[in-house]
Design a protein with these regions (language model features):
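A polyanion-binding, active-site-adjacent surface
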Residues: 1-131, 135, 139-177
Length: 177
């Protein structure tokens, strides 16, 4: 992952894109999902620029850390349970290093469900928590988990998510933070 180690907001995707983060070495960098995400982050003043092309592009994100559950591209974009399990320790380490973390924004249902399963290893969560875009849930350690549709080209092109929806969610997070 990358960003501000003093982050209050953690943005979690599922995996690096084969021709984006996997190629560039930075999550949501050099792909269409990243173009959408960083435009939104820039417009709500979390990022200093509206693009993320490569790790030398000068991008800075304020009080935010961005990562993926998987650290490599899953074959055929379908992660196996073993891959998810093997990578979960890396995400747990990232979370434990973010001492000021207050809000976790998951991008996509699979990222949401897998983030939750990692949390359930550490905490007894009795409440039923379901993926619903824009829904927020208080976690046992006081952090807030928020679900969002993934900003994939398919979701953007079919208008499942748009710039206004994502910006509204980021503004909501700003009020929680």
């Amino acid at each position: 992952g990358f960003g501000d180690i003093k982050a209050k907001l953690l943005i979690v995707g599922l995996a690096p894109a084969a021709h984006g983060g996997n190629r560039t070495g930075r999550a949501f960098t050099g792909d269409k999902s990243g173009e959408f995400l960083f435009r939104c982050l820039y417009e709500v003043k979390i990022a200093n620029q509206s693009f993320s092309n490569n790790i030398e592009d000068g991008l800075k994100i304020h009080s935010t850390y961005i990562t993926n559950i998987l650290k490599c591209v899953p074959p055929k974009d379908k992660p196996s349970r073993k891959e998810l399990y093997n990578c979960s320790q890396h995400l747990e380490n990232e979370i434990s290093n973010l001492k000021n973390l207050r809000v976790i924004l998951t991008l996509g249902k699979i990222a949401f469900e897998n983030f939750l399963s990692i949390y359930k290893k550490k905490y007894d969560i009795k409440k039923k928590i379901f993926f619903k875009h824009g829904e927020s849930y208080k976690l046992p350690d006081g952090k807030t988990l928020i679900a969002s549709y993934h900003p994939s080209p398919r979701n953007v092109n079919t208008k499942i998510i748009n710039i206004k929806m994502m910006k509204n969610l980021l503004y909501k997070i700003g009020h929680i933070n």
